[in-house]
């Protein structure tokens, strides 16, 4: 007895084959080219209909993942008999899952079974009574759309895919623009080499080439729209005494074509940058307020989605982008990296070298909170007040570490100090003291301050001593490692020399024997 399990958009169909060895005969499968032959060979045994479109989507996803759903298990348990039967399925993963259930089926899933399934699905409406071709097509189309939406995980509110693609394209554009600009400067530099030293902006350089052409036209060309007045005068003066070679009209046309590409790329890059900035402010305004548009977009792109990044802890956000360095450090038992992509944030850049790690940790912690607010708060608007509030806290911490005011956020966002209203008290005349008594009284405040400074100095000295000890230990370890390596090299060289000597002696002995 042989059964064929066919999955449709309407439900599961279990077909009984007239020939139990049909999957082994390639000629029988090839003969199934008409509806009559298929109907003659297969009869409907059981049909498990899906309850709704959502149920159909669940069942389809279960088949793709190679899982047996409750409906399918129920269908197979009802169909099993005392004798062992053959069950032909289309998916190998599904076949393995059915085998694990321990039902009385010999599951088959090979190339011949795929051809059999193809023939059955071609004439499926003839095998299923009450289900016409148009209805089945409509169901299949609806299921395909549902599966597409499920796979894409599309959400109108959180379109972070746009950010991921935009930042990737922006990076590619930067690389292309740099390559084109370098090629253009080298090419036009043969004619006017002094221009590249005066004009560093690639887009402005390309626009000058398009406006001026050959350097002999510099004195007659108006470059006021491209350059400031002082730089324009320098360019015109340099053009008169330039050491470059002459170029033909054909050369100039090709250089101009490249310059046009650079100008177009620069304009599109600016447009794309503005688009990315607007998308970031719409999707993750608080993260943008904390780390900026580009760093925020790179973090989202590296994590894969805004949700994945929001679920990550602050420590992961801190070292995101430095995975290679992290695993290398863990492998070699060295210090792990302090920052990844977040290093390029403006707040980390403002910190001095010794405080960069601390600020990166603080910024990552506040950025993680802002991310969760952006991602999971259902009633939030597109304002960045929460992010600005957190940024003010990070700036306060930075000012504390650096020892100077480094706050840049507006005073409105900063936390206002609480004003406590106390009861009015009568003047206490007994608390008055004379100058002599004041001079005689010990200065407790100054003593406290001195003790505090001494404690701080002691802590610093202890830290410095620990650091020195650690450095000495590391140096000793490195020296020992070098000694061991040198020793191994010497031993290996001695061994190789010894082996060569033995081989030479053997050859000489062999040669002597042959002579004798």
Curated annotation (Swiss-Prot):
Any one Gene Ontology BP term: endonucleolytic cleavage to generate mature 5'-end of SSU-rRNA from (SSU-rRNA, 5.8S rRNA, LSU-rRNA)
Biased composition annotated in UniProt, kind: Low complexity: 429-444
Xref: Pfam families: Nop, NOP5NT
Subcellular location: Nucleus, Nucleolus
Primary location: nucleus
Record-level Gene Ontology MF annotations: snoRNA binding; snRNA binding
Entry superkingdom: Eukaryota
An annotated GO cellular component: box C/D methylation guide snoRNP complex
rRNA processing found in the keyword field: yes
Keyword Acyltransferase: no
Comp. bias regions, Acidic residues: 445-456
Nop domain segment(s): 283-403
Role description: Required for pre-18S rRNA processing. May bind microtubules.
Protein's UniProt name: Nucleolar protein 58
Gene source species: Candida albicans (strain SC5314 / ATCC MYA-2876)
Protein's gene: NOP58
